[in-house]
Amino acid sequence: GSSKAALDSAMKFCALELAPNIRVNSIMPGMINTSLIKNRSAFSSEQLANDIKKYPLGRYGETDDISSGVIFLLSAASKWITGQTLVIDGGRTLL
């Protein structure tokens, strides 16, 4: 939506302004298995089953899926990456 677009623009602006000494990137996660999902108080089993079908990898993400992306962006392996959004969504945005 528009709030994600605004955050993306702000991230890119910061990446340009703070370069070359500071790298700025963002992460756009898909649905993450949290207590909200696990307790199923917010969604019915049918709603969850229908939503999971929208994920090519067949499941919601786990917190370690996101933390792995954070670790990558903080590591030297990403030293030439700035102004980028790392999409970690199990392929959801492909559909």
What are these regions (language model features)?
Residues 3, 11:
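Active-site helix of classical SDR
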Residues 16-20, 32, 61, 74:
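A short hydrophobic alpha-helix cap/turn motif
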Residues 19-23, 81-83:
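Short, small/polar-rich loop/turn modules that mediate ligand/substrate recognition or access, typified
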Residues 41-55:
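A short C-terminal helix-loop "cap" of Rossmann-like NAD(P)-dependent dehydrogenase/epimerase domains
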Residues 55-66:
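A conserved structural motif in NAD(P)-dependent oxidoreductases
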Residues 66-67, 73:
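Non-catalytic, hydrophobic alpha-helical segments
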Residues 71, 82-95:
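Short C-terminal tail/terminal secondary-structure segment
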